[in-house]
Amino acid sequence: MTHSLASLKSSGPTGLMFHHFHGNGHLKSEGSFSADEFGRSLDHASRVANLLSADVFLEKALNQNLDEADICCSFDDGLQCQFDVAASVLTSKKLNAFFFVNTGPHAGHPYILEIFRIFRNQFFENKDVFFTEFDSCLETTMPEIFLSAKKTFPEDYLTVYPFYTRGDRWFRYLRDEILTPDEYLEIMKLIIQDHGTSIGEINKKITMSPESITQLAAQGHVVGLHSHSHPTNITRLTATEKHSEYSVNSEYLTGYLNSAPKCMSHPNGVYDEEILRVLREMNILVGFRDNMDSVSDRSNLEIRRLDSAFLPRD
């Protein structure tokens, strides 16, 4: 599948996927949008496809009448920068969007993946410097695991995402396929401590507050599930753990919204048939992936998305 803005004309119903924003107190990071850049990217998208508000897109999906060029705007990971920077742009364009929120940080369990991303951006000159330090720490702390991974790394790993460098793909291979969550956390804690900060300090700055989530819903945006703890690979969990990820996520959001969410996006785009079954049992009606790959017999829980990295900003 071609990854480009032009592909929206004929790729089938698609979500535009956004994560990070800078401005209004939030520092610039890799891939982040300013308010102006975000507005221009939506303008570009609306010229080549039919940009719908989330509630309209959702209704058309449920009625099975989405058009080939229908697109919508979506946000993952429940980040405060999305509320502080992007929400006002959406208001100015009279557009509402999907906001998919993982709720672990609200239960005292910080979203480690995003905290580590912010740490990399703020404490390292560039990601390659971080990758080098990560490799060095892993090789020193867990040498057998490191050497084994070097032998088994598939060169085509994640090449479906052309904006990933080889360093990106190697790091994600270590993180998502080789290390256990506890092993990855151990390595990252060592590196963070070496730089004089903590997970808790970073978490305070990035997590979208319950009040902001409630305000988004009041403004007409559609808030949905994104799992509770945002596992890097949710398919590695047991059946009970998979169900818990979404049921707990739903409990938190239902408390904020006074109604149960009916939509979701798959964390890291990862899911399996068991997860789809869990979502159907929870009456989740619409779900989004994180890529543009074709899926045979695609259900409404597997709608494709175009990463914001492919959207022009000028």
Short names for language-model regions:
Residues 79-80, 229:
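Short, glycine/acidic-enriched loop or turn micro-motifs at the edges of active sites
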